[in-house]
Amino acid sequence: MSRWFANPDAITAPDDVEWAPWVRYTRMPPVYDAPGTKEVAAYTPEEQALNSSVHESGHAVLYMAAGHRINSITLDPADGLQREAQASIDYEPGATGPWLDFVLKDAAGERAETRWLHETGRWTPGRAWVAERHAWHDRKHADEVVRTCHGRELTFNGDHGDWGDYAWIMDRADEALDPVWEQVLALAHYVAEHRRVTGEEAARITGFAR
């Protein structure tokens, strides 16, 4: 078992779901001494662009490694005011397969982001917390997959032996990222440089057949 921290300052979310576990809980303790997550992370524009590209490339590579397809990855630039550079994936619709393919894809973004922070010497407890808080949409989707496929709610109990607990899913995502980590980095740098990458380009860069 490992401890999770409840974050009472729920991030922006619809009123009816903002206190759901996939929004509230983080493995890193919450940070309250800054106006928002942007100030806690304190990235340069170049760091933020690459950080977001790594996050989305983690999703994309595990998804493609499982035999699924994406249409594109797009990195929207910062607007110079409030919005930071933010990458997103357009997934090819209609994918089917084992439930684990989809929850590992969901967890891979924040796990790739955290790994990149460690490997590049950028990791801080605050930045790790920000990575988790920004991943609530991914965690929500993982919850939906577990509910649909198994009729149970995704838990945040820190139970590394329970396949329905997010700690277990994060561990499996870490393991799945190990053999494809170089592909994740290669794709991330390409996204950060080119801003938009087609599914065909992503498959070529990572070596996965399309």
Region locations from a protein language model:
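Soluble catalytic regions of large protease machineries
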Residues: S2-R210
